[in-house]
Structure formats: C-alpha cells, structure tokens
Amino acid sequence: SRKHYAVCVRFDNGHSGDGEKDFLRSMPDSIDAVILENAATLNSADLEDIPVLQTNFATKVLFSFNLTSIKENAESSGQEIKTLLAPALEQMVSAITDNGLDGASISYTGDIGLGNNAAVNASITEMRQLLLDKITPLAKNGKIFFLESNPLFIPEANRDVFTRYVLNTTSSKNASQLRLLINEAIYYAGIPSDKLLITGDPELMTTDNNDGLVSQVPFFAIQVIDCGPIGGLMIQNVAADYSHANITYKETRGAIQTLNPSPLK
C-alpha cells in the first residue's frame, strides 16, 4: 500500500459572521489534524463541528498551546515561569478533556536551554519538566501531541511523548534551505523522518528549482517527498484567506492530492 503523508492545518477558530470559511466544517476532508488557534474559547459552531470531523473524517482536533507567549509574559511581568505555566497547562488539559479534543500542539520558539547561562538553562529545564509532567500521562492514555519547535528542546528520553515534530520552515527561501533544516532534524536531532512535518504558509512565496517565484504550499507539498520523504506538511493560517477565490482552500486540497492522490473514479 502506498505511504500516507500527513496534511495538517492551523485554523483560527472561534469567529462567526464571516460566512462558512470561519467554520471548521469548511475544512477540506482528508485533513489529518487541525490545530485550533483559540481552543480555550470554543464557540457553539466549533463544538458542533469537532465531533463531525473526528467521526466522519478521522481528523484529529488539537489544542494550540503557545509556550513562547507564556514564557515571555512571565519574563516581562517578573514572575516565575511556573506561576503562569501551571494554570495554563491545567486550562489546556481541561479543554482537551471537556471538549473531547484529541490532544495539543505545543509551539515554542525561545531559548532551548543548551547555552552557557546556567540560570537560563535551569529555568528552561523547569519549564520543560512542568510541560512533560502534565502531558506524558495524557500521551500514555492515547492523546496525541505535536511539537512546533526546535526538536532539541525535548530530551531524547522524552521524544516518544510527541507524535509529530513540526519544523517552522516558512522562512525557507528555496528547496536547499528546506533540505538543510530537514537533514538537521533527522541526522543531528535524531528525529525519525516519518514523524517530521514541514510548514508552509498560503500567504508566502518561495523560489522553485528554476529560480522562479512560486506559492509556498504547493511547492512544499512536493518537497515533503523530494527532500525526504518525511511525514508530511503543516499549513498555517488556513482560515486567514478564503477570499482570493478560495486560493487557500484550493492549495490545501491540492497539497492533499499531491501527497495522497485519490484513485480516479
């Protein structure tokens, strides 16, 4: 049987009044996972749509957890990280449990605690431990977690807690920059290639192999196979722009078709 590549999306949920594009039901089917930007505040439409996606399309619905902003808030307010992180993690677990979500995607772009500053490293270690202590039991009970960060943030002994490692590749200007990031994750960080996703943004362009400017999402979909093969593609900002004649929708559908061609009827 042919390999299935994951196509996952970030969705800015919780809006209404702007038409169908703002509802989860407007997602193309065959999406493997949708990360809800505002999973702490689900509206009635979200709550109606989530079980439909899960049941009819086997789509995993994940809570988006922004570790970067929590750390920055702690630093700017002079509080200890655990003072803000502990309640935020509790809120995440409650949202997952109460609303039947499949897990969470943890995004973090800060210092990963491998530098020379002992105080910084100690604070990062504490933050990471709080996170792992909270999500490891959930992972053992079947919830799934993505990591949107430098994979080295998670020690090797804890790597199995995460189903997918998502590389932020939207700033990659071409295939060779992309390949470099992929190879670093596989050969330096030791992440299995089938757990790895790259990220494309429908609003961004990149340079193709002939130095022409092309839309990032369709080009990156091809690179999942050409630069890998790796696990799949994460598409950012899916609800941001359905107005350009549904370009985002078409590109998302196109990426699914590129990676997992459906048999012709």
Language-model region placement:
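Secreted glycan hydrolases and related glycan-binding modules that recognize and/or cleave
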Residues: 1-265
